[in-house]
UniProtKB/Swiss-Prot annotation:
SMART domains registered for this protein in UniProt: IFabd
Protein name: Interferon tau-5
Signal peptide bounds: 1-23
Known role: Paracrine hormone primarily responsible for maternal recognition of pregnancy. Interacts with endometrial receptors, probably type I interferon receptors, and blocks estrogen receptor expression, preventing the estrogen-induced increase in oxytocin receptor expression in the endometrium. This results in the suppression of the pulsatile endometrial release of the luteolytic hormone prostaglandin F2-alpha, hindering the regression of the corpus luteum (luteolysis) and therefore a return to ovarian cyclicity.
Gene Ontology MF terms in the entry: cytokine activity; cytokine receptor binding; hormone activity
Cystines in this chain: 24-122, 52-162
Distribution of this protein across tissues and organs: Constitutively and exclusively expressed in the mononuclear cells of the extraembryonic trophectoderm.
Keywords tagged on the record: Antiviral defense, Cytokine, Disulfide bond, Hormone, Pregnancy, Secreted, Signal
Organism (species): Ovis aries
GO biological process: defense response to virus; female pregnancy
Highest taxon of the lineage: Eukaryota
InterPro entries listed in its UniProt record: 4_helix_cytokine-like_core, Interferon_alpha/beta/delta
Taxonomy of the source species: Eukaryota, Metazoa, Chordata, Craniata, Vertebrata
Additional comment: IFN-tau genes are intronless. They evolved from IFN-omega genes in the ruminantia suborder and have continued to duplicate independently in different lineages of the ruminantia. They code for proteins very similar in sequence but with different biological potency and pattern of expression.
Subcellular location(s) per record: Secreted
Length: 195
């Protein structure tokens, strides 16, 4: 687990180099919040993931959306926003409160909310008139289905400690993917199709 965390943190740190600006400092503040949220998720570890191997599940993380050219420029920002919103929704529940250290959980929810608030300040600059179309964007539907699968899994498992541990590890993967997407947005100044 320590090796995996080190690898994830290294990937996140690599993405912190100087990048473009969307006029709202997306690359700086958002990336710092993302790094802190990953650290908090790591600190929330209460069980060894090895003790929960029987509960493992492939949630079908839609990584292909941030790899290669599958995600269009006008879809990247809403996908990032949706991933963070769904992450917040997952941890801001009564079931989550019962499973985790309250202080760490509150810090994580605050960090996710800060990322969302920051994205809200950038949304108009990046999206313009596209906001009304967000519900119909296929990648957004894919993200929603992914998180619905996580909610369904937790319910199936009775919100057990092992189920939450599996979800915690999965959320580290998801937030790492969202960090990769943030990196692409900032590196290209919001234009995913630029060289």
């Amino acid at each position: 687990m320590a090796f995996v965390l080190s690898l994830l943190m290294a990937l996140v740190l690599v993405s912190y180099g100087p990048g473009g600006s969307l006029g709202c400092y997306l690359s700086q503040r958002l990336m710092l919040d993302a790094k802190e949220n990953l650290k908090l998720l790591d600190r929330m570890n209460r069980l060894s993931p090895h003790s929960c191997l029987q509960d493992r599940k492939d949630f079908g993380l839609p990584q292909e959306m941030v790899e290669g050219d599958q995600l269009q420029k006008d879809q990247a920002f809403p996908v990032l926003y949706e991933m963070l919103q769904q992450s917040f929704n997952l941890f801001y529940t009564e079931h989550s409160s019962a499973a985790w250290d309250t202080t760490l959980l509150e810090q994580l929810c605050t960090g996710l909310q800060q990322q969302l608030d920051h994205l809200d300040t950038c949304r108009d600059q990046v999206m313009g008139e596209k906001d009304s179309e967000l519900g119909n964007v296929d990648p957004i539907v894919t993200v929603k289905k992914y998180f619905q699968g996580i909610h369904d899994y937790l319910q199936e498992k009775g919100y057990s400690d092992c189920a939450w541990e599996i979800v915690r590890v999965e959320m580290m993967r998801a937030l790492t993917v969202s960090t990769t997407l943030q990196k692409r947005l900032t590196k290209m100044g919001g234009d995913l199709n630029s060289p």
